[in-house]
């Protein structure tokens, strides 16, 4: 029987699962991994500045690769530092394996330094509500069981992070047995309730009788299930307009004639008109929940008169919103494949309604798609955020990947950025932790080394996790960081200023030299004050061959293009 050290077993298993990178912060409780990493040459360790940053990097890696991300740090302070990042992954359904080191079993509850075992801090309990599984692995004997069980829980629907607290005994003990890959079991699994799906297809066909205005709202499930290509094929075949949620931006090309753009927060006028305009007969919701931002502050429930068909692998989402129409438990890919296979049965009705849909869509598109389009080419100073984002979109290759952080810049990017492919617009849209995109870009670049990566972030976000620019620079990753530096917590300031001078002051930030900060960390740094310099500076940064940061001196007094969303949320208080 084959035996190997616990650390070697873990690293070999990660390689067997297709991973090429491990994001980590070294520390005493994970020291045994250091010599093991020297033995496993197929796995590149990436050293983050902060344990939270390591998890954000793993999150970015997962989102960009379609695999899972792995992060490693010590228990106790390390696991507590990871908590927010793990929570962000859970709320967005990002598959992560988070591993923390723990003291030897015989030292638990004896005052050992950084003991976070179940008898003290109990970091598995800290992680439990943030993960799909949080478990202590006490010995190497049960490492094989818990490792594979954790990955099974991670890949099961809905996907999300898992946590293993690895005692010293588990790391240095001998693990018996060969590893059997887990991901392969899930690669072929496309669950679908056939009966519910067949009923949905009949309902779609019926809707094309007297009522033919059908649209799709595509959510993150389309991306998770690799269903974007099939969605495009079906939409084109029967002239079905497609809107996406902000989380799923890019799963349908936004320059496609059938694209409505984003619906919900930072959404387009076309998507709002199609879904809430009162003429829609049937809305096919693919892989999206009905959270606040993806439903225009839940107004889709009240304002849309359309019958809804909801396809999702998340049973909680289906049961919570079952009253909205017909629910189909299952993957978007499997449902769209069934739709393709049943084309002969549903084609007469869908084809009959296609001309009517084209007329309806043409009427919608006769109006402008975006709000305040004059802001895309303003030549005023300080620079308007929309102007900077438009210039960056022009500079970044079509298949480039944008990571967007949390703040006012998220609204500008969500509204004005054009995404053409799945996994090319990446943002933590549910929990929305500030600074997430800065380290996440490291993971994205590791997963997609041939793609150009740009981060749209803010000065408030830089205060949170800007130090991870040094990680990108350390590994000479050619990431371009664009800091929309408006000397404020943008969204919060826009609200606070209404209440007087002190609230506005409390939400303002000193005008830091972020370009100088980047240079101090080993990156190239540029400062732009004149919008006429944006194009040349972005090109220079993209050509730098290493990490670059552009400090864009931006205007904070710029209302965000979320007018439709605000109309639905007028009675509520917001913060981001």
Predicted regions, residues:
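N-terminal alpha/beta PP-like core and its mobile active-site loop of ThDP/TPP-dependent enzymes
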Residues: 1-346, 398, 478-481, 518, ...
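Thiamine diphosphate
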Residues: 109-118, 319-321, 327-329, 333-337, ...
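Phosphate/pyrophosphate-binding active-site segments
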Residues: 138-141, 179, 202, 207, ...
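Small/polar loops that bind or transfer phosphate-bearing groups
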Residues: 25-26, 49, 73-74, 219, ...
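Conserved short loop/turn motifs at secondary-structure junctions
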Residues: 219-223, 377, 458-460
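Active-site diphosphate/adenylate-binding microenvironment
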Residues: 7-11, 15-20, 25-28, 33-38, ...
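Active-site phosphate/pyrophosphate- and oxyanion-stabilizing loops and adjacent acidic/basic residues
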Residues: 35, 59, 125, 232, ...
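Short, internal active-site loops enriched in acidic
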Residues: 168-171, 409, 556
């Amino acid at each position: 029987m084959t035996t190997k050290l616990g650390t070697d077993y873990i690293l070999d298993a990660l390689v067997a699962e297709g991973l090429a990178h491990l994001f980590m912060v070294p520390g005493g409780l994970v020291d045994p991994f250091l010599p093991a990493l020297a033995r496993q040459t197929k796995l590149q360790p990436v050293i983050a500045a902060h344990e939270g940053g390591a998890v954000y990097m793993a999150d970015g890696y997962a989102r960009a690769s379609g695999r899972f991300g792995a992060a490693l740090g010590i228990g106790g302070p390390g696991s507590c530092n990871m908590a927010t990042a793990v929570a962000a992954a859970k709320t967005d359904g990002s598959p992560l394996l988070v591993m923390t080191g723990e003291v030897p079993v015989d030292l638990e509850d004896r005052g050992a330094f950084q003991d976070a075992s179940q008898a003290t801090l109990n970091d598995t309990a800290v992680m439990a509500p943030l993960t799909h599984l949080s478990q202590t692995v006490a010995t190497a004997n049960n490492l094989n069981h818990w490792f594979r069980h954790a990955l099974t829980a991670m890949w099961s629907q809905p996907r999300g992070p898992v946590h293993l607290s690895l005692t010293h005994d588990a790391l240095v003990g001998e693990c018996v047995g060969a590893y059997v890959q887990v991901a392969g079991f899930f690669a072929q699994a496309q669950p679908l309730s056939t009966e519910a799906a067949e009923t949905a297809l009949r309902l779609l066909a019926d809707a094309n009788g007297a009522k033919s205005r059908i649209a799709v709202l595509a959510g993150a499930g389309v991306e998770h299930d690799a269903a974007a290509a099939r969605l495009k094929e079906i939409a084109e075949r029967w002239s079905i307009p497609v809107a996406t949620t902000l989380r799923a931006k890019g799963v349908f090309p936004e320059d496609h004639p059938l694209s409505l753009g984003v619906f919900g927060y930072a959404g387009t006028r076309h998507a709002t008109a199609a879904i809430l305009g009162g003429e829609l007969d049937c809305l096919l919701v693919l892989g999206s929940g009905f959270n606040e931002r993806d439903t225009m502050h839940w107004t889709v429930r009240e304002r849309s008169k359309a019958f809804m068909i909801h396809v999702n692998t998340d049973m909680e989402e289906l049961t919570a919103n079952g009253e909205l129409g017909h629910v189909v438990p299952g993957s978007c890919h499997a449902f769209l494949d069934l739709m393709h296979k049943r084309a002969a049965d549903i084609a007469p009705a869908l084809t009959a309604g296609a001309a009517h849909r084209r007329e309806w869509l043409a009427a919608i598109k006769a109006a402008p798609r975006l709000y305040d389009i004059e802001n895309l080419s303003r030549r005023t100073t300080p620079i308007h955020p929309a102007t900077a984002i438009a210039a960056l979109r022009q500079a970044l290759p079509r298949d480039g990947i944008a990571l967007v952080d949390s703040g006012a810049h998220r609204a500008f990017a969500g509204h004005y950025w054009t995404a053409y492919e799945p996994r090319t617009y990446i943002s933590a849209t549910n929990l929305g932790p500030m600074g997430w995109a800065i380290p996440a870009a490291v993971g994205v670049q590791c997963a997609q080394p041939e793609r150009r990566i740009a981060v749209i972030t803010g000065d408030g976000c830089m205060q949170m996790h800007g130090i991870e620019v040094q990680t990108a620079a350390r590994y000479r990753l050619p990431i371009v960081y664009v800091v929309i530096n408006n000397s404020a917590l943008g969204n919060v300031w826009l609200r606070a200023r209404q209440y007087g001078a002190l609230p506005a002051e409390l939400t303002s930030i000193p005008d830091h030299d972020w370009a100088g900060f980047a240079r101090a960390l080993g990156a190239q740094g540029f400062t732009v004050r004149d919008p006429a310099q944006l194009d040349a500076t972005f090109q220079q940064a993209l050509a730098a061959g290493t990490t670059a940061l552009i400090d864009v001196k931006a205007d904070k007094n710029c209302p965000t293009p979320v007018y439709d969303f605000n109309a639905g949320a007028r009675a509520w208080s917001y913060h981001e």
